[in-house]
Design a protein with these regions (language model features):
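Active-site-proximal helices and loops of the catalytic beta/alpha 8
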Residues: 3-213
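Low-complexity, disordered linker/stalk regions enriched in Pro/Thr/Ser/Gly
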Residues: 211-260
Length: 260
């Protein structure tokens, strides 16, 4: 019954991805092997879980930016169901707990442009086979191609020169992360006027791409402190974006409109 209803968790794979990102060694063999033997590939994948974050010390071993690079790798792939662990609000490699309190929102890292772009890429690539290569035979970067339709490039170290081979169909592509950097594919070669920056994600596809309106965002300023001592007061700066109708309410009182 469990095998029919549940999914295997690829914990070892997550460990391999963490090591690959932090050591800048995204070899094809490391990235491609799920370490599950003959188990069905309907597993859950992650870069880190809450246990990895706290008990394994990944909170100080891996920055949020590195977690996002790992997320791009596992989410661009054909198989698995990726699970994103959102770290505590205002946490860092110096402070694992951040402003962690019951009811407090987590970190905004899941809203990062790279996360958003690769999530939409995954949906657009359903049904496409995958091909994993190291561009220019450079194992500090990896390219995950999905048929001839799209590709995600994750670069962990120095700026990466283009001009490498690809299965992408000929045409012009825009990096869906920054929305502006153009890449050209002609006769099996991918080129751009710009190098691929270190510690970055490039998401390339045209077929299946959809333009969405920016979602409304509300929150508090990044330096907001929540662990206020009893009897003390604090100033809280509310933030909002992509909306003209943000509101807050205190203790059941009437809602009050505010601007960013």
């Amino acid at each position: 019954m469990y095998k029919r209803q549940g999914h295997t968790t690829a914990s070892t794979y997550g460990s391999k991805i963490r090591g690959a990102i932090t050591n800048n060694t995204l070899s094809k063999g490391t990235v491609s092997d799920y370490w599950l033997g003959d188990a069905p590939l309907n597993m859950v994948t992650w870069v880190e879980s809450h246990d990895n974050y706290i008990n394994d010390g990944n909170w100080y071993n891996m920055t949020k930016e590195q977690v996002i690079l790992g997320w791009a790798v596992i989410t661009a792939r054909k198989d698995g169901t990726p699970l994103f662990f959102d770290r505590p609000y205002y946490s860092s490699v110096e402070n694992e707990w951040g402003m962690n309190r019951i009811g407090t929102e987590g970190d905004d890292m899941y809203k990062d442009k790279s996360v958003k772009a690769v999530n939409f890429f995954r949906t657009a690539m359903i049904g496409e086979d995958e091909n994993i290569v190291n561009p220019n035979s450079d194992s500090t970067a990896v390219m995950i191609e999905r048929g001839t339709k799209g590709a995600v490039i994750v670069n962990t170290k120095d700026a990466l020169k283009t001009g490498f081979e690809t299965n992408l169909a000929d045409g012009t592509y825009v990096n869906r992360v920054d929305g502006k950097t153009e890449y050209t594919v002609k006769n099996g070669k991918l080129t751009s006027d710009a190098d691929i920056p270190a510690n970055s994600v490039v998401v390339l596809y045209n077929d299946g791409y959809k333009e969405y309106e920016a979602a409304a965002e509300v929150g508090v300023a990044e330096d907001t402190v929540f662990n206020i001592q009893s009897g003390k007061t604090a100033t809280v700066t509310l933030t909002c974006a992509n909306t003209d109708n943000a509101e807050y309410a205190l203790n059941g009182a009437a809602a009050v409109s505010y601007k960013n």
